[in-house]
Design a protein with these regions (language model features):
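Methionine residue identity
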Residues: 1-2
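Short hydrophobic alpha-helical segments enriched in small aliphatic residues
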Residues: 5-7, 19
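Glycine/threonine-rich beta-strand-loop-alpha-helix active-site module
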Residues: 107-213
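Glycine-rich phosphate-binding loop
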Residues: 123-134, 292, 297-306
Length: 326
């Protein structure tokens, strides 16, 4: 029933608006359907998946790349060295932007954009969990349009055209956010407690590399949290106001794969871990086009409120989803 109650107010901001308050400029599902007489379904141009998919970087065309990273696990497990070496084989110079925090901040984004403006890359590569990829998407916007502010792009579909300076490659290491295939990025202003839910097909990555070997490094707790994030994406996409014959099969198959593999993945089964990496990507394709619902509204608001004691977004979803369904 709650989904029916909230349909008229479901935000194009994929449920990231404050509960009970739809920010000026957000668009209801009914308005979107009126606008989208001819609907749109958008995915990355290329998606490479499976064992050794990371080696695709050897064939990438470009001159300079920035590699955006999180807390250090990708370097610790040797993936950063691999990426730098593959890019070197392709004749590409690489600069690292490291230390992107969970739920990335406005300050982190602006610092990264400044690095890009000085280095002038024609490739932006983000590797890690959802946070470094989300942050890199926002950096991309401010790299290509330095005059832009967050206020300029906070409303849906207000990001100016990209790809004049760089193309974007996303390489996920966790199996939950699926930001490697979505049109969304969430950036937090901790001074105000505001989360900026950037939503525009412009920030859909050009290339996604879904290599299961990166997900094998996840600890158990992160496996559980990201798995519940993926399950919530799939369920909400399936009942979303903008679901379609294109998004439904992706959502359904993702739900089935997650039910079949999440527990085994949590227990250390690497085949199941690889299946979860694919399932979360399918869920991302679904929700990027169908949008989400009230579970994510609640989860993102919680994340902004409790910034001093970080609650993983997937854990928030796990807490709320049963109550919302009931």
């Amino acid at each position: 029933m709650m989904y029916n109650v909230f349909v008229a107010k479901q935000s194009i901001e994929i449920g990231y608006s404050n509960v009970g308050y739809i920010r000026k400029g957000s668009i209801s599902v009914i308005q979107v359907k009126e606008m989208l007489v001819m609907a749109r379904f958008t995915l990355p141009r290329d998606l490479y998946f499976g064992e050794n998919a990371l080696e695709t970087l050897k064939t990438i065309k470009g001159n300079k790349a920035v590699l955006c990273l999180g807390g250090g696990s990708m370097k610790r497990f040797g993936f950063v060295d691999k990426v730098v070496e593959y890019l070197k084989e392709a004749g590409i110079e690489t600069k690292l932007i490291e230390g992107i925090e969970p739920d990335p901040s406005v300050e982190t984004v602006m610092k990264g954009a400044k690095v890009m403006q000085e280095f002038e890359p024609d490739l932006i590569i983000a590797m890690g969990g959802g946070s470094p990829i989300d942050a890199a998407k926002a950096m991309w916007v401010f790299y290509e349009h330095p005059e832009t502010t967050f206020d300029d792009i906070k409303d849906p579909f207000t990001i100016p055209p990209l790809r004049n300076k760089a193309t974007f490659i996303a390489i996920p290491s966790t199996s939950g956010t699926a930001t490697e295939v979505t049109a969304f990025s969430v950036i937090t202003d901790y001074s105000t407690g505001i989360k900026y839910p950037l939503a525009d097909f412009e920030i859909t990555p050009d290339v996604a590399i879904v290599d299961p070997s990166l997900a094998e490094t996840m600890p158990q707790t992160l496996t559980a949290h990201t798995g519940m994030d993926a399950l919530t994406h799939a369920i909400e996409a399936y009942v979303a106001g903008l679901h379609s014959p294109f998004s439904d099969p992706l959502a359904i198959h993702a739900i089935e794969m997650i039910f079949d593999n999440l527990k085994a993945s949590y227990e250390g089964d690497m085949q199941a871990r690889g299946n979860m990496h694919i399932a979360q990507c399918l869920a991302g394709m679904a929700f990027s086009n169908a949008l989400l619902g009230i579970v994510h509204s609640l989860a993102h608001k919680t994340g902004a409120v409790f910034d001093t004691g970080h609650i993983h977004h997937g854990c928030d979803n796990a807490i709320y989803i049963l109550y919302v369904i009931q």
